[in-house]
C-alpha cells in the first residue's frame, strides 16, 4: 500500500467562493507537480450526482465536480456536506475545513532482501529516510507559499516519523551538550583548588 500525507485547508473566505476554489485548485496542481507525488484528492474531485436534474444514468456517465464551470457550487457543496461518504473525509462537518489527501509514489523496493547484507539494507533504509525528509521539507515549502490564502496543516505517518527523527536528533545534541557542560562544571568544582 502507498503512504499518504494529509493536508487540512481552511480558507480565509467561504469554502466555495471562486477565490477559495481557485486557491485549492492551484495548491492541488502545485502538489501534484512534485516528483514524488502519485495523486492528490481534494474536495474538488468529489463526484456530484445530485447537482443537476438530468436522469441518474446520464449523471453517472458524465458526473460533474465543484471545479466544473457549469456547476452550482453551493448546491454541490451542500451535497458533499450532507453525504455520508464524503462528510468527515474531504470536508469537516461544519464545512469550513477541507481535507487534501496526497498519495506518495512507491519507492523502489529492495529486491532479494534475504540475499542482501545488513550494510546494504541499512543504506537502503537511510536512503528512504533521507528521501522522506526531503519530501516533507518540499511539501512544507509549498504550504508556506500558500499561507496567505488560509490555514493549511500537514499530517500523516511519513510526516510524523520524519518529525520524530528530527526531534530525537535535536534532543540528543541538546542532551549531549548538557552532559558535557555538567561534566566540565563538576570537574572544575572538584579540581578548582588544584589549579
Residue ranges of model-derived segments:
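Short helix C-cap/helix-to-loop transition motifs enriched in small/turn-promoting residues
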Residues: 30-40, 49, 66-70, 110, ...
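A short acidic, often aromatic-flanked loop/helix-cap motif at beta-alpha or helix-coil junctions
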Residues: 46-51, 160-162
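Generic detector of short, locally flexible boundary/turn motifs and exposed helical patches
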Residues: 4-6, 53-56, 61-69, 117-120, ...
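Flexible hinge/switch segments at interdomain interfaces of large molecular machines
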Residues: 2, 53-56, 91-96
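Short, glycine/acidic-enriched capping/hinge loops at junctions between secondary-structure elements
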Residues: 17-20, 53, 112-113
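Extracytoplasmic/periplasmic
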Residues: 1-48
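Extracytoplasmic
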Residues: 67-194
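Charged, often glycine-rich, active-site loop that binds/positions anionic groups
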Residues: 21, 25, 50-67, 165-173
